[in-house]
Amino acid sequence: MSDNNEKQTLRTVEGRVVSNKMDKTVTVLVERQVKHALYGKYIKRSTKLHAHDADNACNEGDVVRVTEIAPMSKTKNWRVVEIVTRSAE
């Protein structure tokens, strides 16, 4: 087992806010490209994450950077670190 002194790196991903209807929570769509095992074609895959937005600062369409945290609820274990770009609205 590893030492407790080693700092564990937290995963950080970028995605687009698709919903901000919940209080202090946003839904972030994270897209990635995966290579098909047999044919080699790159395919888009996406994941929706619930992230904590303490200030309710995010709007739909914003590109945000989120990082992993300890679970805050059943589905929410990400936190908005920064808003990379604002939506045009």
From Swiss-Prot:
Q: Does the keyword RNA-binding apply?
A: yes
Instruction: List, alphabetically, the InterPro entries matched.
Output: NA-bd_OB-fold (IPR012340), Ribosomal_uS17 (IPR000266), Ribosomal_uS17_bact/chlr (IPR019984)
Q: Per the UniProt entry, what is one GO biological process?
A: translation
GO: which molecular function terms?
rRNA binding; structural constituent of ribosome
Task: State the GO CC annotations.
Answer: cytosolic small ribosomal subunit
Q: Does Ligase show up as a keyword for this record?
A: no
Q: Which UniProt keywords apply?
A: Ribonucleoprotein, Ribosomal protein, RNA-binding, rRNA-binding
Q: Which Pfam families match?
A: Ribosomal_S17
What S-S linkages are listed for this chain? none
Q: What does this protein do?
A: One of the primary rRNA binding proteins, it binds specifically to the 5'-end of 16S ribosomal RNA.
Q: Which family does it belong to?
A: Belongs to the universal ribosomal protein uS17 family.
Assembly: Part of the 30S ribosomal subunit.
State the protein's name: Small ribosomal subunit protein uS17
Q: Which gene encodes it?
A: rpsQ
